[in-house]
């Protein structure tokens, strides 16, 4: 796997769990001897939902809810077979979406 790159994108609603997952990935990759670039914070996606508080009238009374999706990017340069095995066995917290591109 020489001169290859693994790109890992992490997404989560809570930034603390996202940072702990990123720290686990970086620690396991550096322990096996691979070069790591990141975690790079990507722009936070913000979804805003506006609803009417009352059921039938009072349109001026509204409530807003937002959902933030935090994202991080980690590049692992020159991974070894040990690195890939360590990443496959890694136990990440729930609520973190992981996308891996080789």
From Swiss-Prot:
InterPro entries per UniProt: Ribosomal_uS10 (IPR001848), Ribosomal_uS10_CS (IPR018268), Ribosomal_uS10_dom (IPR027486), Ribosomal_uS10_dom_sf (IPR036838)
- Top-rank taxon of the source lineage equals Bacteria
* Cysteines joined through disulfide linkages: none
- Pfam families, A to Z: Ribosomal_S10
> What GO terms fall under cellular component here?
ribonucleoprotein complex; ribosome
Q: Which NCBIfam families match?
A: PRK00596.1, rpsJ_bact
Entry's family note: Belongs to the universal ribosomal protein uS10 family.
Q: State the protein's name.
A: Small ribosomal subunit protein uS10
């Amino acid at each position: 796997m020489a001169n290859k790159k693994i790109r890992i994108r992490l997404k989560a609603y809570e930034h603390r769990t996202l940072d702990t997952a990123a720290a686990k990935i970086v620690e396991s990759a550096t322990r096996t001897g691979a070069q790591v670039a990141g975690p790079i914070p990507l722009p936070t996606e913000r979804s805003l939902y506006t609803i009417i508080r009352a059921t039938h009238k009072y349109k001026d009374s509204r409530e807003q809810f937002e959902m933030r999706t935090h994202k991080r990017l980690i590049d692992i340069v020159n991974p070894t077979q040990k690195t890939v095995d360590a990443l496959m066995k890694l136990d990440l917290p729930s609520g973190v979406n992981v996308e891996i591109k080789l």
